[in-house]
Amino acid sequence: MAHPHLLAERISRLSSSLEKGLYERSHAIRLCLLAALSGESVFLLGPPGIAKSLIARRLKFAFQNARAFEYLMTRFSTPEEVFGPLSIQALKDEGRYERLTSGYLPEAEIVFLDEIWKAGPAILNTLLTAINERQFRNGAHVEKIPMRLLVAASNELPEADSSLEALYDRMLIRLWLDKVQDKANFRSMLTSQQDENDNPVPDALQVTDEEYERWQKEIGEITLPDHVFELIFMLRQQLDKLPDAPYVSDRRWKKAIRLLQASAFFSGRSAVAPVDLILLKDCLWYDAQSLNLIQQQIDVLMTGHAWQQQGMLTRLGAIVQRHLQLQQQQSDKTALTVIRLGGIFSRRQQYQLPVNVTASTLTLLLQKPLKLHDMEVVHISFERSALEQWLSKGGEIRGKLNGIGFAQKLNLEVDSAQHLVVRDVSLQGSTLALPGSSAEGLPGEIKQQLEELESDWRKQHALFSEQQKCLFIPGDWLGRIEASLQDVGAQIRQAQQC
């Protein structure tokens, strides 16, 4: 076997050659190439005139000396037009019912069938055997067929509960194509003088028969790690719970796994990675509704679970909660304690500030943030004279929230431990403390847990960075995963700064 990274580079260059002159079809070309390299079938859905047939023709050039067959189905198409005419000579001389297959589907490596759903039962039945078993019954003989890629196309989906569903289920990759959208690409397409039938692939990049056969065995040796299987099973269970989810047969799941193995193999890896699971978005949908649903579920899987994003956030939440508990346990020791004055028999208890509190403006920290006057508040600034008067005589007390703006009216009280407590509208309280009176920095227990969590985050991010070099995965998906990991990292760093 060639060095894995050299193989990945070669396949990338091969795909780039196949994509030349085709605008906004890179993803379709890459998945069709992956299907061809792993012996799978593709269904292209889209309106006429959007290069569906050209995609199939291009794939012929991926292989040395590959033969191609393409046919436009109609309601009147006959098996002879697809599988070859009967041999009159064999029937006349020997009474054998045998087809002349040269130039037809049974002898082609690349097959393109347009308007596939218009095929009649006789064609469909033979086609199913060809896809499933790579065999063709020609008279009394069963012949192996060399088909590496079947591309079927239509501008519509098969009717539900029709005889076409069996064939549709064999189309592992399903791609929904549209017209060229980008203005610059549209202009380039209109003015391009490239002959679409020219071979754009250098001979050195084309796949030989020996390489193709060897790769089929090596694809099967790619491992499926336990954590990747758990992600697949999680997706399957989630789909089973949704009432509108499409039915996905066990056969389709099994074929999809081989596609994931091929993606890993041609990306230079020895095992399927979570990033390969994004390919399932093009394998599991049935119609427009299920296409959106499948993409949503895989997006949740990729941005929430594939690199332990949700698990790390859950751990972070537990660490933050523990930090709050420790802060609350320390509140009695760190809180500002006022001095109770005499006057037991007076109507209102009087207090005064400690003698060491002498600043004209006092900034008091909330042991836990509160939402006051529609603002998340972490500290309050008081005029010392106003606070002294309130402690002595009661009445209204005002302070600047987070030290800014006008002084706002506050619900402030002295608790039984002689601590100042501010309350929000729901009467949730937070003890006030002088700056520097609270514990310095994070507790050792919390600091260690956050460092371990950050280390795990770095490992997951490094894994993703290594795995994202995958030709067959669109860049926008990789961008969303990167953003989800960066969000987790930012929350961890924020917690470390508290």
UniProtKB/Swiss-Prot annotation:
Its main location: cytoplasm. CDD domains: AAA. It is a peripheral membrane protein. GO terms for cellular component: cytoplasm; cytosol. Pfam families: AAA_lid_8, ATPase_RavA_C, bpMoxR, LARA_dom. Gene3D superfamilies: 1.20.58.1510, 2.40.128.430, P-loop containing nucleotide triphosphate hydrolases. It is an enzyme of class 3 (hydrolase). One of its GO terms (molecular function) is ATP hydrolysis activity. ATPase activity is stimulated by ViaA. ATPase activity is also stimulated by interaction with the inducible lysine decarboxylase CadA/LdcI at low pH. The complex formed with CadA/LdcI represents a possible means of regulating RavA activity in response to acid stress conditions. CadA/LdcI may stabilize RavA oligomers under acid stress conditions. HAMAP family: ATPase_RavA. Component of the RavA-ViaA chaperone complex, which may act on the membrane to optimize the function of some of the respiratory chains. RavA functions as an ATPase. The RavA-ViaA system is involved in the regulation of two respiratory complexes, the fumarate reductase (Frd) electron transport complex and the NADH-quinone oxidoreductase complex (NDH-1 or Nuo complex). It modulates the activity of the Frd complex, signifying a potential regulatory function during bacterial anaerobic respiration with fumarate as the terminal electron acceptor. Interaction of RavA-ViaA with FrdA results in a decrease in Frd activity. It also interacts with the Nuo complex, known to be involved in both the aerobic and the anaerobic respiration. A protomer can be divided into three domains: the N-terminal domain is the AAA+ module, which is composed of two subdomains, the alpha-beta-alpha subdomain and the all-alpha subdomain. The second domain is a discontinuous triple-helical domain. The third domain, named the LARA domain, contains a compact antiparallel beta-barrel-like domain forming a unique fold. Binding between ViaA and the triple-helical bundle domain of RavA results in the enhancement of the ATPase activity of RavA. The LARA domain mediates RavA-CadA/LdcI interactions. This is Regulatory ATPase RavA. The gene is ravA.
